[in-house]
Amino acid sequence: MALTLVGIRNDVAASLGEDPADIPLDENLIDYGLDSVRIMALLGGWRREHDVRADFADLAEQPSIEAWAPLLGVS
């Protein structure tokens, strides 16, 4: 199954222990407590479950769901 914007938001929220509705699409996720270890864990899961080919550096450079969507293959 393809990764979706909702799926990314849900996964990020779960990683942070937050409600998905509290995670904006366009905000810097570092400001919400996302760190490099969590980014790596999220990316690992997406690679296994959705065959994502994004690089950690690309996600770390642009830490927002909106910026990640095209990198993760969400159209």
Task: List the model feature ranges, each with a label.
Residues 13-32, 49-57:
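Phosphopantetheine carrier-protein modules
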